[in-house]
Amino acid sequence: METVQSIITEWTDPKSWEKLVQHSFKDSNWKELIDPVNYKFNFGVTPFSQFQIIPIVLVIYLVTIFSIKFLMKNRKPFSLKFISILHNAILCIWSLIMCVGVLYEIIKRVSNEGPLFTVCEDPNGGFDKGVTYYWSYIFYISKFYELLDTVIIVLKKKPLIFLHVYHHCKTVWWKKYITMIQILQFVCLGIAGVLHVYTINTIGCFTHYPAFAAAYSINFSFLFLFSKFFVKSYTPKNSNSNTNIKSKKID
């Protein structure tokens, strides 16, 4: 409850917004981006840690996207082939590094602390420091970089759909299986969530319920959206149109 109240106070206090405007990036501890062992999350010191950063970035993002879209209205699309390849390569390498880092740390801590480490939190705190939470923070930072996806799409004059990560041509055969894997991922996360709730209620360990509720609300929203996309794109009613598109491309 104290955390919720502090967030509300932070958002409604005009002085906090004034401090954010005056805040210089040189005041941030940028070493935290490359120091997982000594990582500790500190509001106002850890880069991009202010509550107001999110709405400000989103406003800039939306203004930028729709401005570019307006300017590109009567222009030819940019190819951006090399930039797209480089951007996707960076995302792949970044994701691989995060995956390896998280798996290594989880395996090490489960070996030392037992499997309940993955479910129960330390009631005395500690969720804001350490290697495990460093990778959570790096994942958060990656979301800012991923906003470039939409910029590239708009510059290439590709259609902007809600799930714009799937903006590529629907006739590419492997896209269907990627979507299926994504849906399976969200189903597995949902099952893990049920097991999580069962475990914490059975043994009575501490967990942060607001964070848990927020995380799984997002998970189920993605499950709904990806399932809707799959049904719309790959159900039999669209098979004829997809076949026609493929045949036209072959011709």
From Swiss-Prot:
Which terms does the record give in the GO molecular function aspect? fatty acid elongase activity
The top EC class, named as a word, is transferase
One GO BP annotation of this record: fatty acid elongation, polyunsaturated fatty acid
Query: What PROSITE patterns does the record tag this protein with?
Result: ELO (PS01188)
| InterPro entries associated with the record | ELO_CS (IPR030457), ELO_fam (IPR002076)
Its record classes its membrane topology as: Multi-pass membrane protein
Parts of the chain that traverse the membrane:
51-71, 82-102, 135-155, 177-197, 211-231
Q: Name one GO cellular component term.
A: endoplasmic reticulum membrane
Compartment(s): Membrane
Keywords attached to this entry: Fatty acid biosynthesis, Fatty acid metabolism, Lipid biosynthesis, Lipid metabolism, Membrane, Transferase, Transmembrane, Transmembrane helix
The Enzyme Commission number assigned here is 2.3.1.199
Q: One Pfam annotation, family name?
A: ELO
Main localization of the protein described in the UniProt heading: membrane
List the catalysed reactions. a very-long-chain acyl-CoA + malonyl-CoA + H(+) = a very-long-chain 3-oxoacyl-CoA + CO2 + CoA
Coiled-coil stretches, from where to where? none
Q: What does this protein do?
A: Could be implicated in synthesis of very long chain fatty acids.
Report the sequence similarity comment from the record: Belongs to the ELO family.
What name goes with this protein?
A: Putative fatty acid elongase DDB_G0274669
